Regions:
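Conserved short histidine dyad/triad with adjacent acidic residue
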Residues: 30-67, 86-88, 98-102
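Residue-level recognition of well-ordered beta-strand positions that form the cores
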Residues: 50-52, 79, 116
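A short, N-terminal "cap"/entry segment at the start of jelly-roll beta-barrel domains
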Residues: 1-47, 129-134
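Ligand-binding loop in jelly-roll beta-barrel domains
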Residues: 99-126
């Protein structure tokens, strides 16, 4: 097997719809975009990507999912938020959602995360854009 190398700066952001569903586009804009770094699922491995979440001004992205394999999330920029849009976790944080774990995220500011799955990516139960609570 050969090593995989990806020039992150040269890799293009692609729509997140194939993995996150049609709600990854809002008012004609891709609010979830991915740079797939590796996909070894066909060989029994996992998939890794950079994900960029870009909620519209005054809104937040709410995601509810179930981990179909161990999911490692490293927040590189931005982070999770409360319903009021206040930061709950800043960049530099790490989360492990083990296989079978239901979990959720609310994102109120542009966020970039490195997400690594040991197998299949999350099953997205729901994803919606909601108003930031006053």
């Amino acid at each position: 097997m050969v090593s995989t190398h990806v020039d992150i700066e040269q890799a293009e952001w692609t729509p997140g719809i194939p993995f996150y569903g049609p709600a990854a586009r809002y008012d004609g804009k891709d609010i979830v975009q991915l740079k797939v770094l590796s996909d070894r699922r066909a060989e029994g491995g996992g998939i890794a990507w950079l994900a960029k979440f870009s909620p519209p001004r005054g809104k937040l992205i709410k995601i509810v999912a179930t981990a179909l394999s161990d999911e490692h999330v490293f927040n590189l920029e931005g982070g999770r938020a409360t319903k009021s849009g206040a930061p709950a976790r800043a960049s530099g944080g790490y989360t492990l959602n083990p296989t079978g774990q239901p979990h959720s995220a609310m994102i109120a500011a542009e966020t970039v995360s490195l997400i690594i799955y040991s197998g299949e990516p999350d099953q997205i139960v729901s994803m919606e854009v909601i108003d930031v609570a006053a």
